[in-house]
Curated annotation (Swiss-Prot):
<protein>
    <recommendedName>
        <fullName>NADH-quinone oxidoreductase subunit B</fullName>
        <ecNumber>7.1.1.-</ecNumber>
    </recommendedName>
</protein>
<dbReference type="GO" id="GO:0051539">
    <property type="term" value="F:4 iron, 4 sulfur cluster binding"/>
</dbReference>
<comment type="similarity">
    <text>Belongs to the complex I 20 kDa subunit family.</text>
</comment>
<dbReference type="GO" id="GO:0050136">
    <property type="term" value="F:NADH:ubiquinone reductase (non-electrogenic) activity"/>
</dbReference>
<keyword id="KW-0472">Membrane</keyword>
<keyword id="KW-0004">4Fe-4S</keyword>
<keyword id="KW-0520">NAD</keyword>
<dbReference type="InterPro" id="IPR006137">
    <property type="entry name" value="NADH_UbQ_OxRdtase-like_20kDa"/>
</dbReference>
<comment type="function">
    <text>NDH-1 shuttles electrons from NADH, via FMN and iron-sulfur (Fe-S) centers, to quinones in the respiratory chain. The immediate electron acceptor for the enzyme in this species is believed to be a menaquinone. Couples the redox reaction to proton translocation (for every two electrons transferred, four hydrogen ions are translocated across the cytoplasmic membrane), and thus conserves the redox energy in a proton gradient.</text>
</comment>
<dbReference type="GO" id="GO:0005506">
    <property type="term" value="F:iron ion binding"/>
</dbReference>
<keyword id="KW-0411">Iron-sulfur</keyword>
<feature type="binding site">
    <location>
        <position position="132"/>
    </location>
    <ligand>
        <name>[4Fe-4S] cluster</name>
    </ligand>
</feature>
<keyword id="KW-0408">Iron</keyword>
<dbReference type="GO" id="GO:0008137">
    <property type="term" value="F:NADH dehydrogenase (ubiquinone) activity"/>
</dbReference>
<comment type="subunit">
    <text>NDH-1 is composed of 14 different subunits. Subunits NuoB, C, D, E, F, and G constitute the peripheral sector of the complex.</text>
</comment>
<dbReference type="Pfam" id="PF01058">
    <property type="entry name" value="Oxidored_q6"/>
</dbReference>
<dbReference type="GO" id="GO:0015990">
    <property type="term" value="P:electron transport coupled proton transport"/>
</dbReference>
Amino acid sequence: MGLEEKLPSGFLLTTVEGLAGYARKGSLWPATFGLACCAIEMMATTSGRFDLARFGMEAFRASPRQADLLIVAGRVSQKMGPVLRQVYDQMAEPKWVLAMGVCASSGGMFNNYAVVQGVDHIVPVDIYLPGCPPRPEMLLNAIIELHRKIQEMPLGVNREEARAAAERAALASTPTIDMKGLLR
């Protein structure tokens, strides 16, 4: 007989990681990094029609030290890249990044020297949200997907090793502007 048979019915069994993931996913504090038209759609998501508060995100944080989700909305110029990295480094662990819009994800239609071809060359991105600009419903769907990822994330040393390996791989990749292909 296992432990499950000896406990009274209705008794909840879970792992510490599962419980911590459930608590973390319901208490995300987003910081905005709105740089273009995607920021307007991000602001619309906080309105009563879409009700971002039901996901535990009542207010966007003004300081990165109070946030654990960075939503990069819009294109990032080369001069803004170090500022984005500084904001990311100031955030408390655990932290997540959502690249909102095609400009944040891959540079969008701005294929020139002045625009970073994807913020994943500056910070590690957890969720990519396509669209130009993506609708508030798509942002809500991306947040739900991020909740699923957070629920399944390991705790402690395993999480730190996985995060460090992902960041090293992303920063060591070839920049999109250096890639040669059919569109060049």
